Amino acid sequence: MDYKTAGVDVKAGRAFVDLIKTSVNETSRPEVIGGIGGFGGFMRLPHGLENPVLVAGTDGVGTKLELAQDYHAHFGVGIDLVAMCVNDVITSGAEPLLFLDYIATGKLAPKDLSEVVKGIAEGCKKSNCVLLGGETAEMPGFYSKGRYDLAGFCLAVVEEKKIIDGSTIKAGDQIIGVQSNGLHSNGFSLVRKVLGMSGANKSILVDTKKTPLIDSLLQPTALYVELVQSLLKHTIPIKGMAHITGGGLPENLPRCLPNGLNAFIEPGSWDIPEIFFWLKKAGHIPEDDWWNTFNLGIGFCLVVSTDQVEAALEICTEIGWDAWTIGRVQEPTVPGQQRLIGLPE
């Protein structure tokens, strides 16, 4: 018996690398040394940094992959993978430099997986980071044929004196919420249960734009790199940032606040997309689970002083983002109060 008979096609793996080369090369940056195919990727740090600090992040796409593979939405989950990583590291004010991907599959399907990598490359291009390397592992018997899992790794850099860590946030500062692109990549274990329980037709229209349900659910995660870089280039003094992922606003917004401060949120201050109301109704999801599972239309938060709100909102609008003042930072009104208050119970 040979390796191919055992389920691993080495020649197909080499052909797959050739298939994705163009997409990968399109993500290059001037700091890159050499090309793809070596044992490691090489990259210089950008010029002009006095005390560069590296910021690393890793993430996956979760069970959204199950739904995406059922409906052949391979390109979109590639973007999701990049977004879940870069959106985390930019909360420190860092600039993404490079991305690495890991794909594990039961049987190499070059057409499907090349679409995944094209999506990853697209996410990297929009984030101005190079897809410097990756690994595709064919694992017969471990994953079923036609199924794959993804993991991503991002490295970013920030000038040490410009690190944004929330330490300057004080009571009275304002919280700006930036629109999400739908569910992003969180809550899909619940979504899949709701779909199974409701028996909903995946092609039903769920909003005023007449978007089919499956398209609304599988919208790629928004990339906030350009937005944050634009705000920083306009010298908006951002005090803190939060990427709203699993756990929603209650779990993620307090992560950028100093100890001893709370966030007060006004739920009616932004438009919650209709897909979230559909899920809540179809799945009989309790109010607190709804808020603690989904982003509900807010994918990223900025904390700025009151006198910077107007300028920050103007920049968001100029580059095509809907954004709202959704709350404020305050001191706890009673001992032991939750870090985020104001949400419906």
UniProtKB/Swiss-Prot annotation:
Keywords attached to this entry: ATP-binding, Cytoplasm, Ligase, Nucleotide-binding, Purine biosynthesis
Pathway assigned in UniProt: Purine metabolism; IMP biosynthesis via de novo pathway; 5-amino-1-(5-phospho-D-ribosyl)imidazole from N(2)-formyl-N(1)-(5-phospho-D-ribosyl)glycinamide: step 2/2
Example GO BP: 'de novo' IMP biosynthetic process
Top-level EC class: ligase
Reaction catalysed by this enzyme: 2-formamido-N(1)-(5-O-phospho-beta-D-ribosyl)acetamidine + ATP = 5-amino-1-(5-phospho-beta-D-ribosyl)imidazole + ADP + phosphate + H(+)
Pfam (any one): AIRS_C
Chief site of localization: cytoplasm
Record CDD domains: PurM
EC number: 6.3.3.1
Annotated GO CC locations: cytosol
Name under which the protein is recorded: Phosphoribosylformylglycinamidine cyclo-ligase
